[in-house]
Design a protein with these regions (language model features):
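RTX-like calcium-binding, glycine/aspartate-rich low-complexity repeat tracts
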Residues: 1-364, 368-466
């Protein structure tokens, strides 16, 4: 029986309302969390509804949500085991054993549910703690039960697994824990809320029905990851080497070192990324759109408006990919490098040693923090015109490659002639007023997130290449 004999502990408040808003008040406290796919109703003793086994796609969705070992290696970092320090073990398709979390289908259920949380919160007895049920029907998402990243059945796997690990609904006050703050209560922040967009109603099916068929979150989102790491610690061993994450405009898939890590049901990209360490890259070289690439913790990057999630009515997600928060200020999870495309791209660095490749277009580079931020160009010095402005920014122009704006940059390097320029020594080659281009950077680096950002005092070096 699921909860019998498995140890749970009380979850104390973190003091951060964005984390506490999804905590239920208890979580598992065993060295290994075991899960299984039940084969019959006999696994449960006395249940008051019919039973069916999961199909292969639902099993794959559960593996993606929980295990770093059961799915493709490229998917490991998106799983609970991949971003927390908690070990997870799959017991198999069985009615035996003492799994913490068991999965089955209730063909009469519309949606999904968990029988009880860790710690017997509902109070029905510990035997059903962690039992997850997929519904045999979804009146709000059609009759298809095939789960794939971004569709409703995939979302159920993430949402109900979150409950089984110790997360509550973000939109509800429950068990002494308040709901999420209004501005962070949506799918952009958590899979645990019923609010698809900020301000939507959590009490009707209407908004769910308006979400695009492939527009649900593809992974646990920022607040889910932060809350689960608060309870179970963080994993810095998954993708701890140099990892390249890439995307294309004609697919919703996320590629990890060239392999599919998120096999999307459609063209939408809607996920949060945690990385364990190494020198890591966001590669957007396939795009010709005007990219907004934000590497800050909690920040969001926009690759293509056509690939933004439709969250109901006229509301779309604020980004395609979001960065997880740092865990206790540890910089190993930061992304260090970004490669732009052929559009007019905007890059925002973090506190790591950043390297940016701009590509074509009129790009904007903001080095952020650091004492020695660099921009490197492949051409010779004489091919570029540099203007310095009263606000400290620079514009670097090339007849073919475009005009770039440099902010918080200390050195410019022209690799062909190995010329190194100190920005403090640069005088404008032509006297011009400040050139400014307003960038609408829409992401999650909002004031509401600042309380969870912890930064190191070290002064990094940011390198920008074009």
């Amino acid at each position: 029986m699921s909860g019998t004999g498995n140890r749970s502990v009380v979850t104390r408040r973190s003091g951060n309302g964005l984390i506490d808003g999804v905590l239920v008040g208890a979580h598992w406290d065993d060295e290994i969390i075991h899960y299984s796919f039940s084969l019959s109703a006999n696994a449960y003793g006395d249940i008051d509804h019919p039973f069916e086994i999961l199909n292969a796609a639902q099993e794959a969705a559960v593996h993606f949500a929980l295990s770093a070992a059961q799915g493709p290696a490229a998917s490991a970092g998106f799983s609970f085991e991949g971003f927390t320090a908690q070990a997870v073990n799959f017991l198999g398709r069985t009615d035996e054993g003492n799994a913490h979390i068991r999965y089955g289908i209730d063909p009469e259920l519309d949606g999904g549910r968990v029988s009880d949380f860790p710690g017997d919160i509902v109070g029905t007895g510990e035997a059903d703690d962690g039992d997850v049920w997929f519904g045999g029907q979804l009146s709000w998402a059609g009759s298809e039960t095939y789960a794939q990243a971004g569709n409703a059945h995939w979302h159920i796997a993430l949402h109900e697994t979150g409950h089984a690990l110790g997360l509550k609904h973000g939109h509800q006050d429950y068990n002494g824990f308040d709901a999420l703050p209004f501005n962070q209560d949506s799918y952009e922040f958590t899979v645990m809320t019923y609010r698809t967009f900020v301000g939507s109603s959590p009490h009707t099916l209407r908004h769910w029905q308006e979400v695009g068929d492939v527009d649900f979150p593809q992974t646990f989102m920022i607040l889910d990851i932060a809350a689960l790491q608060y309870m179970y610690g963080a994993n810095f061993t998954i993708n701890a080497d140099d990892t390249v994450y890439s995307w294309t405009p004609d697919s919703g898939d996320t590629f990890v070192n060239g392999e599919v890590g998120i096999d999307a049901a459609g063209h939408v990209i809607f996920a949060t990324l945690w990385d364990g360490g190494g020198f890591d890259t966001y590669d957007l070289s396939a795009y010709s759109d005007d990219l907004i690439i934000d590497l800050t913790p909690g920040g969001g990057s926009i690759f293509s408006a056509d690939q933004l999630s439709h969250l109901g009515q006229d509301n779309f997600a604020s980004a395609n990919i979001y960065n997880a928060w740092q865990y206790q200020g540890d910089a190993r999870s930061l992304i260090e490098m970004a490669i732009g495309g052929d559009g007019h791209d905007h890059f925002t660095g973090n506190d790591a040693d950043n390297v940016f490749y701009g590509g074509r277009g009129d790009d904007v580079f903001d080095g952020g923090g650091g004492a020695d931020n660099r921009v490197t160009y492949d051409g010779a010095r004489e091919a570029y015109t540099i203007l310095r402005h009263d606000d400290g920014s620079l514009t670097v122009s090339h007849d073919i490659w475009g005009t770039d704006t440099l902010i918080n940059i200390d050195h410019i390097i022209f690799s062909k002639t190995e010329t190194w320029l100190d920005v403090d020594d640069i005088l404008s080659e032509v006297s011009e007023p400040v050139i400014s281009r307003k960038i609408d950077v829409t992401g999650l680096s909002a004031e509401g997130f600042e309380e969870s950002h912890e930064y190191d005092d070290a002064a990094p070096i940011d390198d920008f290449y074009m």
